[in-house]
Amino acid sequence: MPRSRALILGVLALTTMLSLCGGEDDIEADHVGSYGITVYQSPGDIGQYTFEFDGDELFYVDLDKKETVWMLPEFAQLRRFEPQGGLQNIATGKHNLEILTKRSNSTPATNEAPQATVFPKSPVLLGQPNTLICFVDNIFPPVINITWLRNSKSVTDGVYETSFFVNRDYSFHKLSYLTFIPSDDDIYDCKVEHWGLEEPVLKHWEPEIPAPMSELTETVVCALGLSVGLVGIVVGTIFIIQGLRSGGTSRHPGPL
């Protein structure tokens, strides 16, 4: 099936599943829960069913394993969610998509170029475990490949990827995580592939290590420190002598 058809179906799925969320920009609230966000597109039977709170994912339904996956295991102890509910919503989305496809004018969707940023989770210390985060925004349609490279070689160990998060403009964003141990010998890239890009985009990251001081710089710093110390000694000595002289003059007996 050509790419344009896949894009048509992606846009129809998005319109069908999210049209009921309209008008949210007019509502002000301290907290926002998005329950049962369902996205389905074809070909490939691609879909997801998620629960979000204040933009953070609480859980999603694994469509292949047919089970609920909680972002934090502790949440599963507080409540339960039967994955069958999510699977039913996906089936409904697929059915609606097929109907809308037959009634559509087959206008191709527009591929948006996603934007990627790479940053560490914590301040970087060489030899200390850390996590790299690749944040990819402005994704549409929600089909994307995110790959980690270390020294230009693909990395699969320690990689975790979130589901798609829906933005207010109905584009999507996604995060990919890589656990690693920073080393001054390693460089990393987050590789992003999407229909909106003419070629894959690589977002580069490497630890910023302060350059060592040269011998000349060390000599200059030591000389400046020594000079400041000598000036301090001289100035201090002058003040002490002046103080002694002033004290001697005040103690000299005056005329009777």
Curated annotation (Swiss-Prot):
Q: Which InterPro entries does this entry report, sorted A to Z?
A: Ig-like_dom, Ig-like_dom_sf, Ig-like_fold, Ig/MHC_CS, Ig_C1-set, MHC/Immunoglobulin, MHC_I/II-like_Ag-recog, MHC_II_a/b_N
Predominant localisation class: membrane
Cytoplasmic-side stretches of the chain, per the record, are 242-256
| Annotated TM spans | 219-241
Coiled coil located at which positions?
none
Q: How does it sit in the membrane?
A: Single-pass type I membrane protein
**Location of region: Alpha-2:** 112-205
Listed GO molecular functions? peptide antigen binding
Q: Which UniProt keywords apply?
A: Adaptive immunity, Disulfide bond, Glycoprotein, Immunity, Membrane, MHC II, Signal, Transmembrane, Transmembrane helix
Q: Which domain of life is it from?
A: Eukaryota
> What SMART domains has UniProt attached to this entry?
IGc1, MHC_II_alpha
Is the Cytoplasm keyword given for this protein? no
Report if keyword Glycoprotein is assigned: yes
> What residue spans carry the region label Alpha-1?
24-111
* Topological domains annotated Extracellular: 24-218
State any GO CC term: lysosome
Which BP terms does GO give this entry? adaptive immune response; antigen processing and presentation; antigen processing and presentation of exogenous peptide antigen via MHC class II; antigen processing and presentation of peptide antigen; positive regulation of T cell differentiation
Domain Ig-like C1-type stretches:
114-206
The cellular location(s) given in this protein's UniProt record come to:
Membrane
One Pfam family, please name it.
C1-set
Family label: Belongs to the MHC class II family.
User: Per its record, how is this protein called by name?
Assistant: H-2 class II histocompatibility antigen, A-K alpha chain
Q: Which organism does this sequence originate in? A: Mus musculus
Its lineage opens with: Eukaryota, Metazoa, Chordata, Craniata, Vertebrata
